[in-house]
């Protein structure tokens, strides 16, 4: 058997401390570590993966090849809450695949993510 492994989620950004404010509130995470180059957020319950916001000098260019899904029970109230925190809705309507519904959004530094409900996995 190999070593235990885990996945930490890392987002490149221009201002880790500022973007941490958005994601801390969006995910109800807590601060673990922050400096000029990096901000690490961890779940309050210790169950989900940490989110690392890593400062990079180059601006974001193009669509993310990977994104986060925020899975909730009710999409519309969550979308409104995230918009109030500084997110922007990218889809006018709700996308559907079977029982799964989602809306594409982006954080204040234009990193795409989805708000989803009905996810079976």
Predicted segments with their positions:
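Short amphipathic alpha-helices within nucleic acid-binding modules
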Residues: 76-81
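Helix N-cap motif at beta-to-alpha junctions
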Residues: 15-16, 73-75
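Eukaryotic phosphotyrosine signaling hubs
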Residues: 7, 63-67
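Short hydrophobic/aromatic beta-strand micro-patches
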Residues: 10-12, 69-71
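Short, solvent-exposed loop/turn segments that connect beta-strands within catalytic domains
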Residues: 45-48, 61
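Vicinal oxygen chelate
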Residues: 2-11, 17, 33, 40-42, ...
